[in-house]
């Protein structure tokens, strides 16, 4: 199939490198600002994006380990290719919506692990539709709404360990 470019959805950050430490400015030990994110390799037919950020290393008193959700975004417009550092609901691209994190609030809540170094997985999904208005969905409800509509997905992982216990 020569002459055709194969696009692969890629997510990057100027705030941290893939697999590297997330700077304190983006955590509970700093200003707790969302990191800068950018993406490329968007597949044809993309109508919107969704972003979920979670910590698969979170301890839970009821279980040895659980996944803790830090950020839920959806209906990022297909024309968007980046989010600047410190983006808030007021500065999101027009039409973008926030879901509920595991603190029960909306918006970015940065790393704040109680013990050890944790991984933070930034998952970006290219969707073939703009999702209907959802009532501040959590991760599970957003994933359910996206089912059957994901054209491509990618992830970027950063790590963090609290400096002050």
Where is each model-derived feature located?
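N-terminus-centered regions that define maturation/targeting leaders and the start
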Residues: 2-165
């Amino acid at each position: 199939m020569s002459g055709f470019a194969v696009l692969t959805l890629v997510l990057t950050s100027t705030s941290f490198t893939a697999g590297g430490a997330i700077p304190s400015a983006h955590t509970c030990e700093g200003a707790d600002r969302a990191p800068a994110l950018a993406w490329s390799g968007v597949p044809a037919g993309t109508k919107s994006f969704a972003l979920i950020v979670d910590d698969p290393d979170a301890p839970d008193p009821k279980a040895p380990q659980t996944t803790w959700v830090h950020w839920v975004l959806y209906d990022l417009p297909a024309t968007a290719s980046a989010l600047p550092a410190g983006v808030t609901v007021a500065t999101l691209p027009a039409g973008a919506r926030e879901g509920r994190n595991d603190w029960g609030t909306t918006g970015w809540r940065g790393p704040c692990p109680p013990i050890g170094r944790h991984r933070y997985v930034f998952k970006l999904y290219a969707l073939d539709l703009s999702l209907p208005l959802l009532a501040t969905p959590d991760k599970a409800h957003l994933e359910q709404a996206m089912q059957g509509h994901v054209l491509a997905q990618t992830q970027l992982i950063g790590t963090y360990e609290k400096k002050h216990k």
